[in-house]
Amino acid sequence: MLFITEYRLKPNLPKADVKRLMDVFAKRGAAQGEIAHYVRADGTGGYTIGESDDITAGYADALAYSEFMSFTTTPILKVEDALGPIAEYLS
């Protein structure tokens, strides 16, 4: 299953906490099944796109970073995979 996750840094995160966040990220590496990772140009967070059937791994990642940021994870489909259900809905 494909997911897009938006992460938002907690407001007013001190530089020392940003350093600790980067240390955690360096240690953990990319999330299991990560396809892409984009950072917001305004410096407030970013987005990851991943594919996984293991919700437990995603939960473990969210817990590891929860002191620094919040998450919104949404299941997504590629457009070509959505066309069949859309056509069925419209018929």
Regions found by a protein language model. Name each.
Residues M1-S91:
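Conserved, structured core segments of small domains
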